[in-house]
Amino acid sequence: MLTLDKFEEASEIVKKATQETKLIYSKYFSEQTGNKVYLKPENMQTTGAYKVRGAYYKISTLSEEERQKGLITASAGNHAQGVAYAAKEFGAKAVIVMPTTTPLIKVNRTKGYGAEVVLYGDVYDEACAYALELAEKEGYTFIHPFDDPAVATGQGTIAMEIIKELPLVDYILVPIGGGGLATGVSTLAKMLNPNIRVIGVEPAGAACMKASLQAGEVVTLPNVNTIADGTAVKTPGKNVFPYLQKNLDDIITIEDDDLIVAFLDMVENHKMIVENSGLLTVAALKYLHVKDKKVVSILSGGNMDVITMSSVVQLGLIQRDRIFTVSVLLPDKAGELVRVATVIANEQGNVIKLDHNQFVSTNRNAAVELKITLEAFGTDHKERIVNALKEHGYNPKVIRPNL
């Protein structure tokens, strides 16, 4: 059972393994939304995510005998690092089962804390089932990533810090995967101030908690599909579910495209790397239809591998019309490429890629295709460049960039 005494105890214990992440006021998001927006940067924890709070507190509640049997868990990455780090602090062996789709950065960092990593299954649920098998077979103590009151209590220490620093907070936005973080945060927030509204945020492609709350019972999704790998969960926690039924005020679901935009917003306006699951609460700000409120978005983690980061940046630039491609047909004669380039240069467009296809027509002397990938300042600038090409006699077609 989650109690105020346990939350207070956990707040003191987790200080040994975590740092108190101070709220960051966001001028950018405040102006965008008409609220006072603060960010809770759990991506700044030593392990890169909030998960170490729940892992450390849970392990602290175990007996020495339970710890010495060895610890095992399943995780898409951040809980893995939390358990590995906490186990090392307690001098215990840790075995971590991770889905085969887990980003390499999370796998390597988990190993770096001294844990044994086993890759199994495509999603968390499959990895978890295998971890439970190993626990039974080898006698390990299983540390559940979210469906455990002690783990949820540790995660809830985030709410203690938020309310201590911002006593008059109106809204707290919290990411939801299996529900451990949302359980701890919403339960403690309501204990300390029932007027605080706690909004859960899920990826639209893995909205297991929303489906469960609507059904009035825990349900399992047939599949999940989201770039927010840390919250790609089919089945929410059965033990924590009643707390969320009682304490969660609403749920917002977020499409992947919104996460891509949020990543660019964080990089460009806060110079901060936040992983896709951590960006859920940033993307949700525009769907929170309130004004003049104090809002805290919990950034749950920042463990993103460079390849994923590169892909998200590219997609974000394309989505915002800062990179686009046009196809034009040109007569196959000298000087045509210079003419097109001059039109673009006069509009301050920056060419970053050219693809010249002489075989678009059976008569290559009649026309060749030129695909031009450009960098622009945004939608208005893109339209200006396209219109300039039209005015100079070209018939530009905007096509999907192939970078």
Question: Positions of the model-derived regions?
Answer:
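PLP-dependent amino-acid enzyme catalytic core
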Residues: M1-L403
